[in-house]
Amino acid sequence: MTLDARIRRELAAGRGKKSIARDAGVSEWRVRCLARAMVTEVVLGRGEDEIRLSPVKAARMPQDRAIVLSDIHIPHHDRRALAVAVAYLRDAKPTLLVLNGDIVDEAPTGAYPKDPKELITLEDEFAETRAFLALLRKTLPKCEIVYTKGNHEDRLERYLVRQAPELASMGRLSLCALLDLERHRIRWVESSDHVAFGPFEISHGEVVRKGGGNSIRGHMQKRGGSMVMGHIHRLATVMVTDRFGTHYGVENGCLCGLQPSYIKHPDWQQGFTQIDLAAGVVSVRQHHIQGGKLLVDGNLYTA
C-alpha cells in the first residue's frame, strides 16, 4: 500500500492530521491536501488498489411520465392482468396515458372465422370498452389520455365499406362516437399519425417479424428515432446508437389472454411500458405481468 493510501485510510478512520503527519514522517500540509481531495472523491479500498469516482448528487426533479397500454382486445382481455395494470396506473399517476391500439377487438366484423363459443355482439364489446374507458378516466381524472387507432379499431369501418358503403361516412358510426371518447376527454389519433412524447413516436405499428425486438427494429429502420409500438403482443426494448445519439425501440406487450383459440403457444407477454423524462434524460421501464402479478420497486400487485 502506498504512503498516500495509508494516510487516506487513517483520515477515513478519524485520526487527527497532526498525528498522522508525525507518524508518517510527512508535512501536515501534505496530509491536509489529501484530506481536501477526499472531500471531492469517493475512495473505495480494494486491498492494495483504489478506484476513484466522481462525486454524485441525487436530486428530485420534476418529470413527465407516460404509460403505454396496448392490445387489450376487449372482450378477450385478461381480467387479472388488466386489473393489475389499472392498479399500477393509480399509483404511478402518469401525465400521459396512451391506449396504443387494439383496445377493442371488434371480432364480429373481422374477416377471420368466428368460434361460436366465443361469439359476442359488437354492441356488447363497445359497452364493455366504454366501461373500461370510464374507469380509466375515474382513476386518472387529470391525466391526458390518447387513444391511437389499431388494426382492430379499423374492422368496423372496413366492414361498412365492404357491406354497406352508404353508411360508412356516418359520424354516429365512427368509433369516437360509439365509444364516447369526447365524454371521457380522450383524444383520438388515426393510424396514419402518432403520439409524440419527448423523443418518442408512439403508434400501433405494422411491421411484424419473428423474435423479440425485431419488429421494432424494422420500424426504426423505416422511420428512424425512438419509437414505441404495439400490435405484436411482445415485450422488448432495444437501443441503437448512431451519430445522432441513442434511440430506443420498444415493443409494448399485451393485456389480452395468452391462450387464444386460433393459435397455440404464442410468443406473447403481458405487460406495458413506462417512460419518464426529466432534465433531458430518458428512462424506459417495461412492467411484465406474470400470472396476474406485477412486482415494481418492492411493491407486489396481485389480482
What is each residue range found by the language model?
Residues 1-15:
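Short, amphipathic alpha-helical "recognition" segments used to contact nucleic acids or chromatin
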Residues 19-22:
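Short alpha-helical "recognition helix" segments of helix-turn-helix
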Residues 29-51:
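Short, solvent-exposed alpha-helical "recognition" segments
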Residues 69, 74-181:
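Core catalytic region of metal-dependent phosphoesterases/phosphodiesterases
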Residues 200-294:
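Conserved beta-sheet core of the metallophosphoesterase superfamily
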